[in-house]
Amino acid sequence: MEAALIGFGVLLLLILLRVPIAFAMGAVGFFGFWYVRGSLPAAISTAGDRFALLIQTESYDLSVLPMFVLMGNLVARAGLSTELYAAAQGFLGHRRGGLAMATVVACGGFAAVCGSSLATAATMAKVALPSMRRFGYRDTLATASIAAGGTLGILIPPSVIMVIYGLMTEQSIRELFAAGFLPGSIGVVLYMLAVRWTVWRDPAAGPRAERVPWPQRLAALKGVWGVLALFALVLGGIYFKAFTTTEAAGIGACGALLFAMLRRIGWKAIYAVLVESARTSAVLFFILMGALIFSNFINAAGLPEGLLQLIGGQGTPPYLVVAIILLIYVILGCVLESLSMILLTVPIFFPIVKGLAPELGLDPRWVLIWFGIIIVVVTEISLITPPVGLNVYVLSSVVPDLRTTTVFRGMVPFIVVDIIRLAGLTLLPAISLWLPRLFYG
């Protein structure tokens, strides 16, 4: 166990020195495994196995990752966010704080076909912020609603983070997608309540916009048919077992391409999306390979088993163990980027949680699905908390005159409702597990 702790410390040091995480995890995992096993051939064999896993043709299931990345990039380029925001604004804009609520709803809808928090936040900033500024919204509320709404991109399926978690823990991606839908919907409602609370305290923060006549509202709904159709096709097919998650990813990417062509997106733009998606997927696969090598080292060094024995020997209540794990995630989220945090910690914590399944009163089949959802929610919180808060910095890059301190000041009520949601999902696993049990019981 000592070797694993030393390796973990070395890995954190390499990350702080800005060594690319894929190489840092791969190097620490390789040399750590060599040290633990005392055999260079064994270390080379393990690294080779991890590499082969990602390139062998029979592992076509891994294509789910680049396909969902491609779908999200095509949807973002096709401009669906504008129609989503227009429809939500038509129904909510006339209320106090209504444009911020419309932003949250539009973020939820965009997340359902995008799968990336950063892309959701960046795209919605270009669409929603000019409108809210035009009606006199305070920047604290306007930008906070975009940054918080953007976090829904990794929880409402399809989600790239969920795919990575599923690959690392060998869990069903379709069950993870089913488990994320209800918590994501709850997140939309709670963020809207956070907006209501903000404008209740300060009515000038979110003035009313003009009321949109019903004919215009219904006309605006016609603009979101593409999102609804793609969402129903991909997730409906997965949930009702019409096709596998891998097939759904391919169908979703084809559907997004067709929709982009119908929107008259030029071939040059489509080529740029393909290149961007290929680069992103290559980076993710290298990171995943490094994470798998590091995971092998952590397991060989006995860190999860050692921690589990330490916890069991102290008679620590299982939910207190989970609470400590979540606290560690919150602390790490303040200094680490979200993907790095998940890749670093999941290999350590998921065997512990799996071992605690009987004490938690959960079926071993479902415990890691539940754990995956609460990990994603913690990751959402890390995306909007200082000092790292990637969604906040994405907003600052999209809106040059925006100060990050302005966004962080407005984030407090959204972080509070996120913590409430996290507590509810942790103490009531049935919230996350109801849909996957219903569909795949």
Which role fits each region the language model picked out?
Residues M1-G441:
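Alpha-helical transmembrane segments of multi-pass membrane transport proteins
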